[in-house]
């Protein structure tokens, strides 16, 4: 019938990056190229913000020559540092991206994680202090040679926001971006209903949830040690 519109089926694409499975699902556009570009964009941010990939900007910053106190950073890294410093001030250091020495020591992504000795933990903790970073424009100065940065607490949220910006620019009004424990919903379902996001029950089967949220154009973020 001429007055009928074909129902668009959701399209989805997944990939392993950011140490998790990344999945993007679009509900109102049948354009796989948008999905491809979205995951490529996510990969480009991983290659910029990872502290372990040797080609990343953050890795290069952290492994700067011992006598180099000042580095020039990209706009994205500048934005993340500025935002992180703001929350460090608000939390009086409770949030701190200079936690990298502790992150490396604990090595949470190891196949066989081991609790470090207490004296090593104390030694690494002494290197953590957001006040040792001085940001002026795109120039970052380290006030201590032991200072290194880890965006692990903010990178996924920042990346999810950038992916949403890209999808909206491409005319997408209904989508779900899943970056592991970070789920961002773009708009609502095509029928106007909210998205249903389940919160996994720790240490249970993957299909077992303890709570379900119904949200529109919002994010749900969880964190745990069970994955």
Question: Where are each of the predicted segments found?
Answer:
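Mature catalytic core of soluble alpha/beta enzymes
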Residues: 2-227
